[in-house]
Amino acid sequence: MAKLLSCVLGPRLYKIYRERDSERAPSSVPGTPTSVTNPHSSSWDTYYQPRALEKHADSILALASVFWSISYYSSPFAFFYLYRKGYLSLSKVVPFSHYAGTLLLLLAGVACLRGIGRWTNPQYRQFITILEATHRNHSAENKRQLANYNFDFRSWPVDFHWEEPSSRKESRGGPSRRGVALLRPEPLHRGTADTFLNRVKKLPCQITSYLVAHTLGRRMLYPGSVYLLQKALMPVLLQGQARLVEECHGRRAKLLACDGNEIDTMFVDRRGTAEPQGQKLVICCEGNAGFYEVGCVSTPLEAGYSVLGWNHPGFAGSTGVPFPQNEANAMDVVVQFAIHRLGFQPEDIILYAWSIGGFTATWAAMSYPDISAVILDASFDDLVPLALKVMPDSWRGLVTRTVRQHLNLNNAEQLCRYQGPVLLIRRTRDEIITTTVPEDIMSNRGNDLLLKFLQHRYPRVMAEEGLRVVRQWLEASSQLEEASIYSRWEVEEDWCLSVLRSYQAEHGPEFPWSVGEDMSADGRRQLALFLAQKHLNNFEATHCTPLPAQNFQMPWHL
């Protein structure tokens, strides 16, 4: 009877992974059926085959879940319509509650029928036995057996806790349950006394900003967190996850962040291969509709690196919602997992981000300064200009205030706090992070990210002459034009290197540098072009085109 209840309340099972061209060893978990432990299959993974009763009950519950999601998103409009029609009176609401209660009882009955269907299936009984054993005992053998199944990630046991590192428990400077530290935006009106009257005056605007951010804003910024989109992408995500496990021997893990969110991760270990880059770990930060199952992890994987992918809060198996604080909390536990559980030193970790993933990558670079390098692909400097681009001009004040208070993705500000090597990849036909049209390459916010970065590190070089010549170089629409500008100013790379190395030897590596202070205008132009060319690579593609492995290069450093 207990097993039947476990089948009723258990998670949905999607796939069962098998060893290729070999039989699985008999399970060591007591009570596991032996009739299904040795399936004859040449395929490494198979879809779980539910019985008819479970299959039909699952379809009904999935349909109910979709209808509930649609009702949730349309509830404000439905509430307004019902109010106008007078359907929210007590005489109308009571019968409706009876209908709703009856429907819930019917769905509960369907769930029980699904549980009976699972109970009659030896494959599901084997799975639920292993899952229960793993929850009772987190042994390596139980986890190894559980990894052979792909199921609803909410039931996956936690593999790593944010407080697990001993240094966190002893230190008072680490993250608290309120979250890790973020850079806070400066007040819009400096010098204004924050009196009680001023706070009352600001309250309506603050309430409006909060409502916009938590309803329309968050879903526009992170469409991957919308349940209906995830439901539509589920077959693709399952296929991508199977590829990572099957072909790359990936290991899935659940991490618990300091805010209580559970983060879904996938680790591919290449340290045992002959390729030297396998000793380096690339932590991948996906875009606003990207998942590690089908995202940018494929690029460093093809290049031979060890890779750790993770999903944003609210994406696929990760819980929560993707606000900046939750994003930083998730990134913190991912880095801690890489260091303290996977055994990589910060000097062997590379941060690779695509698009909006630049926020978490630059936060980690700022917070973990010993990290080896940062690669930002199709990223931007600040969210405000991009948000203003898609909203009505009359909303400018509301949009700016909402972004600064609730959705402040200040990539450039965070990147300038990092001292290590950085490479920016600019998509020359990017249609997402341009503020006008894709053909206007100067409206690409990747340009602003590069300029702010160089102006912080080399303020004397990026004075008026240097800034002007770098803008000319960024405006070039082809490699031929870039080379023409580079040769026009007769950039001597050996001279630039000698100047930078001599400054570093005399003053140390800490940025910002005052190099170029006593230099001629021509020398500053040469240095500015040299540094811009070393920190930015162009990729002739649109925003969502996968980056080829040959374009995944380590950043330049002295």
From Swiss-Prot:
Q: What GO biological process, any one, is recorded here? A: phosphatidylserine catabolic process
Q: Output the Pfam families linked to this UniProt entry.
A: ABHD16_N (PF22990), Abhydrolase_1 (PF00561)
What EC number(s) are associated with this protein in UniProt?
3.1.-.-, 3.1.1.23
Which GO CC annotations does the UniProt entry carry?
Answer: membrane
* All copies of domain AB hydrolase-1, residue ranges: 281-407
Disulfide bond positions: none
Please give, as recorded in its UniProt entry, the membrane topology of this protein. Multi-pass membrane protein
Primary location class: membrane
**Any GO molecular function:** monoacylglycerol lipase activity
Looking at the UniProt entry, the stretches that span the membrane are 60-80, 93-113
- Which keywords has UniProt assigned to this entry? Hydrolase, Lipid metabolism, Membrane, Transmembrane, Transmembrane helix
Ranges facing Cytoplasmic side: 114-558
Name the catalytic site residues. S355, D430, H507
Q: Which InterPro entries does the entry link to?
A: AB_hydrolase_1 (IPR000073), AB_hydrolase_fold (IPR029058), ABHD16_N (IPR054518)
Quickly give the catalysed reaction. 1-heptadecanoyl-2-(5Z,8Z,11Z,14Z-eicosatetraenoyl)-sn-glycero-3-phosphoserine + H2O = 1-heptadecanoyl-sn-glycero-3-phosphoserine + (5Z,8Z,11Z,14Z)-eicosatetraenoate + H(+); 1-hexadecanoyl-2-(9Z-octadecenoyl)-sn-glycero-3-phospho-L-serine + H2O = 1-hexadecanoyl-sn-glycero-3-phospho-L-serine + (9Z)-octadecenoate + H(+); 1-octadecanoyl-2-(9Z,12Z-octadecadienoyl)-sn-glycero-3-phosphoserine + H2O = 1-octadecanoyl-sn-glycero-3-phosphoserine + (9Z,12Z)-octadecadienoate + H(+); 1-heptadecanoyl-2-(5Z,8Z,11Z,14Z-eicosatetraenoyl)-sn-glycero-3-phosphocholine + H2O = 1-heptadecanoyl-sn-glycero-3-phosphocholine + (5Z,8Z,11Z,14Z)-eicosatetraenoate + H(+)
**Keyword hit for Hydrolase:** yes
Where does it live in the cell? Membrane
Give the family this protein belongs to, as stated in its UniProt record.
Answer: Belongs to the AB hydrolase superfamily. ABHD16 family.
Q: What does this protein do?
A: Phosphatidylserine (PS) lipase that mediates the hydrolysis of phosphatidylserine to generate lysophosphatidylserine (LPS). LPS constitutes a class of signaling lipids that regulates immunological and neurological processes. Has no activity towards diacylglycerol, triacylglycerol or lysophosphatidylserine lipase. Also has monoacylglycerol lipase activity, with preference for 1-(9Z,12Z-octadecadienoyl)-glycerol (1-LG) and 2-glyceryl-15-deoxy-Delta(12,14)-prostaglandin J2 (15d-PGJ(2)-G).
* Name of the protein this chain belongs to: Phosphatidylserine lipase ABHD16A
Write down the species.
Answer: Bos taurus (Bovine)
Please name the taxonomic classification of the source.
Eukaryota, Metazoa, Chordata, Craniata, Vertebrata
